[in-house]
Design a protein with these regions (language model features):
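Short hydrophobic core segments
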Residues: 9, 102-114, 231, 239, ...
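Predominantly flavin-linked oxidoreductase catalytic cores and closely associated redox partners
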Residues: 125-221, 225-227
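Short glycine-rich anion-binding loops that position phosphate/pyrophosphate groups of nucleotides
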Residues: 14, 112-115, 171, 258-260
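Short glycine-enriched, charge-decorated loop/helix-capping segments at active-site entrances
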Residues: 52-57, 124-128, 210, 268-270
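FAD-binding core/adjacent interface of flavoenzyme oxidoreductases
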Residues: 2-3, 74-159, 186, 253
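Beta1-alpha1 glycine-rich phosphate/pyrophosphate-binding loop at the start
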Residues: 2-78, 168-205, 253
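FAD-site-proximal beta/loop scaffold in flavoenzymes
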Residues: 125-150, 239-240, 246-298
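A conserved beta-strand/loop element that lines the FAD pocket in flavoprotein oxidoreductases
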Residues: 72-85, 219-234
Length: 298
C-alpha cells in the first residue's frame, strides 16, 4: 500500500506551521514516512519573515526552509504552483525540471497574499515595496545609493503610500535608515518622510483607540502625513496627485493594501473582497473535499 500524501502549498507562516505541525502529529501517532509523507511546495528555498521586511537589516528575515523542514522529515519542493485539480486531487508545479504533477490525499492551501497594485501609471516601473524579500532588498539598496546621486528636488524625500500597519511600520523605519545612510556618507542634509493615504486618518483598520498613539509616534519622528490623498501617477522624480499637485520624491514605497493569492479563483466558493476563501472551524475549505486553507488566503 502506497503512502498517503499531505501537500502544503506555501512556505510562509501558515504553510510552514502546517507542514511542521503535521509532521509532529504524525510522529506522535507513530506514523512514519512509509505511511504518510508530508511535502511543502514553495517558489524558493526560504521562509521570508515578511512582517519584518521594512527593517534596515534584512539578514534575520530570510530563513532557509531546509533548516526547519529537514529535521522533521518534511520534503521541500521548489517551484511555482501552476494549477490545482480539485477533482483529481493533484497539483501542477513548475520546477526547474519542467511541469510536475503531484498527487495529494490532503492539501493545505497557504499561498498567502500579495501587494495590491492598482492601475496607477508608473507604479510598476518606479515604485518600491516591502512585500517580498527581494523588493525590500531593492529598496534598501536604492536608499543606500541616494547620497551618491546628484542633488535634485525630492532626492531625500521618501513617500510611503498606504497608512495601514505595513505602511506605518515602513514609514517609521525610514528616518533611521536615512540618518544612518547620510551619516555614513558624511552628508547630513535635511530629509523628509511622508506617509500618504486616501483615508482621512492613519491606521483606519486599527480602530479609533490606536489613532492617537500612531499620530504621536509619527509626530515624534517628524513624519509628515498626507491624508485624503489619491495618487494619479508615479515617476522617477516623484508622484502626481489627482488634484494635479506634484510631490517631488526620489523614493515612493507602495504599501496600499494586499489581496489573497489569485489561485483562490480555482476554488468553487465565493471569496470575500480581499480574495479570501471561506473555511469552517477546522480550516476546511467549504464544499471542497480534503482541502484546508490557512493564513492570508482564508
Amino acid at each position: 500500500m502506497s503512502a498517503k500524501r499531505i501537500l502544503v502549498l506555501g512556505g510562509g507562516f501558515a504553510g510552514l506551521w502546517s507542514a511542521v505541525g503535521a509532521a509532529r502529529k504524525l510522529d506522535e501517532l507513530g506514523h512514519g514516512p512509509d505511511a504518510v509523507k508530508v511535502a511543502l511546495i514553495n517558489r524558493d528555498a526560504f521562509h521570508n519573515i515578511r512582517v519584518r521586511n521594512y527593517e534596515a537589516d534584512l539578514t534575520p528575515v530570510r530563513v532557509p526552509l531546509d533548516d526547519v523542514l529537514g529535521p522533521v522529515g518534511v520534503q521541500r519542493v521548489e517551484g511555482e504552483v501552476a494549477g490545482i485539480d480539485l477533482a483529481g486531487q493533484a497539483v501542477t508545479v513548475t520546477t526547474a525540471r519542467g511541469l510536475e504533477i503531484l498527487p495529494y490525499d490532503r492539501l493545505v492551501f497557504a499561498l498567502g497574499s500579495q501587494l495590491l497594485r492598482p492601475d496607477v501609471p508608473g507604479l510598476a516601473e518606479h515604485a518600491f515595496d516591502v512585500d517580498t524579500y527581494n523588493g525590500a532588498a531593492r529598496l534598501n539598496s536604492h536608499i543606500q545609493g541616494l547620497p551618491r546621486r546628484p542633488e535634485s528636488p525630492g532626492l531625500l524625500t521618501i513617500v510611503v503610500v498606504g497608512a495601514g500597519l505595513t505602511g506605518i511600520e515602513a514609514a517609521t523605519e525610514m528616518p533611521g535608515k536615512l540618518h544612518t545612510v547620510l551619516a555614513r556618507a558624511k552628508r547630513m542634509t535635511p530629509f523628509r518622510v511622508i506617509l500618504a493615504d486616501h483615508n482621512a486618518w492613519v491606521g483606519s483598520d486599527m480602530g479609533e483607540p490606536a489613532r492617537p498613539v500612531i499620530e504621536a509616534a509619527l509626530t515624534a519622528l517628524e513624519i509628515e502625513t498626507r491624508l485624503g490623498t489619491d495618487i494619479a501617477s508615479i515617476s522617477p522624480s516623484g508622484m502626481t496627485l489627482r488634484s494635479g499637485e506634484e510631490v517631488p520624491a526620489a523614493t515612493v514605497v507602495w504599501c496600499a493594501g494586499t489581496r489573497a493569492n489569485p489561485l483562490t479563483r480555482l476554488f468553487p466558493v465565493e471569496a470575500d473582497r480581499f480574495g479570501r476563501i471561506p473555511v469552517d472551524e477546522f480550516m476546511r475549505v467549504q464544499g471542497v473535499a480534503n482541502v484546508f486553507a490557512a493564513g492570508d488566503v482564508a
